[in-house]
């Protein structure tokens, strides 16, 4: 009986300790579970689980593989806009390029934060769109003081990728109205390898293109209206997504007025000063004319130095050509004045030579017929036509008068002839003083009105 009681005591003790051990294990498990709930997973462990080697994430495969295409929304923030070069027809811009897409493989719920800002080195661990700039001529990243890149992952799997770039983009320009032209420069964003079956670029709905506050250009006025378009590209390898933004640039005239138009205008006006200089001051007028022509030629060459060698005529070319024409015409005007003012000397020399020939001819005739006075009287020969005047008389010693025997008018004296031609030369100068400025004024009216209308039409076409 005592043995039975002792056995029951041992059995009850065993069950007691077994129950105590079980309760201890349960308590320990709950404690560990509570600790695990109160202490979240470390960021390193979380990232390893999300996109590490053990996560099964493959950056070589796009999201929704063999499914619908990935929609990537783009946004551009312009830090600086400038270095617009007409010779190379390109422009330089510094931007923040932001791309946003959804990758379901990166969605998470284990981590408490709504988003994670990751180091740029993690970019190699995830899939990224193969975006490139179709009209890019040169580009570079920024690495001071670190890589200027941003990677942010959201709970729902959205990915934000931002990068700072400096781009040199081509911008074909029509310079027919230069420097009163309006240009349109584009920026095209295109997928390099993924067709539209895999990837589609779209502009962000709100503020797709932003410009830094206070951004100004030295020679252009950047219009606030940004023209956003889709430019799908069709190649032999397929149809590729493409989006573009068009920047409308209106050239400012201030620089060209000061550097080109006003100096050339003053040179033309300076050439008119020769009209008020005495025609006898040949060195002064010739020196002034040649100087203005050479200066205008240099000015015209300088205006073309900063422009490409295009095959069409520009507005500045027309202006410079007309100014050069006016300056050269002023020099030719003095040549005409000088020629007219010296014509009396040539005329006197010609008359003297002609008179000598006429007198010699008359004397020859006279001696030929002087042997027979009767024949001379019967013929009633008159030497009036040969310049002899009343030296010889006809029959009865009377000079016949009639319609065929008009009395010769005595030529003017050399001084009178000189005065006539000098007055004519002075009249040319007087007419030039009025005609040259008037013609140049008419040209200016037509020039500025026509190109003002063309400029307005270009602006209107851009708005359409």
UniProtKB/Swiss-Prot annotation:
The record marks 294 as: Important for obstruction of the ion pore in the closed conformation. The keyword Hydrolase does not apply. Zn(2+) binds at residues 225, 227, 248. Detected in brainstem, also in neurons that control rhythmic breathing. Detected in superficial laminae of the dorsal horn of the thoracic spinal cord. Detected in dentate gyrus in hippocampus, especially in stratum granulare. Detected in the inner plexiform layer in the retina (at protein level). Detected in midbrain, thalamus, brain cortex, hippocampus, and at lower levels in cerebellum. It is found in: Postsynaptic cell membrane; Synapse; Perikaryon; Cell projection, Dendrite. Strychnine binds at residues 235-240. Keywords: Cell membrane, Cell projection, Chloride, Chloride channel, Disulfide bond, Glycoprotein, Ion channel, Ion transport, Ligand-gated ion channel, Membrane, Metal-binding, Phosphoprotein, Postsynaptic cell membrane, Receptor, Signal, Synapse, Transmembrane, Transmembrane helix, Transport, Zinc. Residues 1-33 form the signal peptide. Disruption phenotype: Mutant mice are born at the expected Mendelian rate, appear normal and are fertile. They do not display notable alterations in motor coordination and startle response, or other neuromotor defects. Glycinergic postsynaptic inhibitory currents in spinal cord appear unchanged, but are not inhibited by prostaglandin E2, contrary to what is observed with wild-type. Basal nociception is unchanged, but contrary to wild-type, mutant mice do not display increased sensitivity to pain after prostaglandin E2 injection. Residues 278-282, 336-430 are cytoplasmic. Disulfide bonds join 171-185, 231-242. Inhibited by prostaglandin E2, probably via PKA-mediated phosphorylation at Ser-379. One of its GO terms (biological process) is protein homooligomerization. Glycans are attached at residue 71. Residues 34-255, 304-314, 452-464 are extracellular. It is a multi-pass membrane protein. The N-terminal domain carries structural determinants essential for agonist and antagonist binding. The channel pore is formed by pentameric assembly of the second transmembrane domain from all five subunits. The cytoplasmic loop is an important determinant of channel inactivation kinetics. Homopentamer (in vitro). Heteropentamer composed of GLRA3 and GLRB. Both homopentamers and heteropentamers form functional ion channels, but their characteristics are subtly different. Belongs to the ligand-gated ion channel (TC 1.A.9) family. Glycine receptor (TC 1.A.9.3) subfamily. GLRA3 sub-subfamily. The alpha subunit binds strychnine. NCBIfam families: LIC (TIGR00860). This is Glycine receptor subunit alpha-3. It comes from Mus musculus (Mouse). The gene is Glra3.
């Amino acid at each position: 009986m005592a043995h039975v009681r002792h056995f029951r005591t041992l059995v009850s003790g065993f069950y007691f300790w077994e129950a105590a051990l079980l309760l201890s294990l349960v308590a320990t498990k709950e404690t560990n579970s509570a600790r695990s709930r109160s202490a979240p997973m470390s960021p390193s462990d979380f990232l390893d689980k999300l996109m590490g080697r053990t996560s099964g994430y493959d950056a070589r495969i796009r999201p929704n593989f063999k499914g619908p295409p990935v929609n990537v929304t783009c946004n551009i923030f312009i830090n600086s806009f400038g270095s617009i070069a007409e010779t190379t027809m390109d422009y330089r811009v510094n931007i923040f390029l932001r791309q946003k897409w959804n990758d379901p493989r990166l969605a998470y719920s284990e981590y408490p934060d709504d988003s994670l800002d990751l180091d740029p080195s993690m970019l190699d661990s995830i899939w990224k769109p193969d975006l490139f700039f179709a009209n890019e001529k040169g580009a570079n990243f920024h690495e001071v003081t670190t890589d200027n890149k941003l990677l942010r992952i959201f709970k729902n799997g959205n990915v934000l990728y931002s990068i700072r770039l400096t781009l040199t983009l081509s911008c074909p320009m029509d310079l027919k109205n230069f420097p009163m032209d309006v240009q349109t420069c584009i920026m095209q964003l295109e997928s390099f390898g993924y067709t539209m079956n895999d990837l589609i670029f779209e502009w962000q709905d709100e503020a797709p293109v932003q410009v830094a506050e206070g951004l100004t250009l030295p020679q252009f006025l950047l219009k606030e209206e940004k023209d956003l378009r889709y430019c799908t590209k069709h190649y032999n390898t397929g149809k590729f997504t493409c989006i573009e933004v068009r920047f409308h640039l209106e050239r400012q005239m201030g620089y060209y007025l000061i550097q080109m138009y006003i100096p050339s205008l003053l040179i033309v006006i300076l050439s008119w000063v020769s009209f008020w200089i005495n025609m006898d001051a040949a060195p002064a007028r010739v020196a002034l004319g040649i100087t203005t022509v050479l200066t205008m030629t240099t000015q015209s060459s300088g205006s073309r130095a900063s422009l490409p060698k295009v095959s069409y005529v520009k507005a500045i070319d027309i202006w410079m050509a007309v100014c050069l024409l006016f300056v050269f015409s002023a020099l030719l005007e003095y040549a005409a004045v000088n020629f007219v003012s010296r014509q009396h000397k040539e005329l006197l020399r010609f008359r003297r030579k002609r008179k000598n020939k006429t007198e010699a001819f008359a004397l020859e005739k006279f001696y030929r017929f002087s042997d027979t006075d009767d024949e001379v009287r019967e013929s009633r020969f008159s030497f009036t036509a040969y310049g002899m005047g009343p030296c010889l008389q006809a029959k009865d010693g009377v000079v016949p008068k009639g319609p065929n025997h008009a009395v010769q008018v005595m030529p003017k004296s050399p001084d009178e002839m000189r005065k006539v031609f000098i007055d004519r030369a002075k009249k040319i100068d007087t007419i030039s003083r009025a005609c040259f400025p008037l013609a140049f004024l008419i040209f200016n009216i037509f020039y500025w009105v026509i190109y003002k209308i063309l400029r307005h039409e270009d602006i209107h076409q851009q708005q359409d």
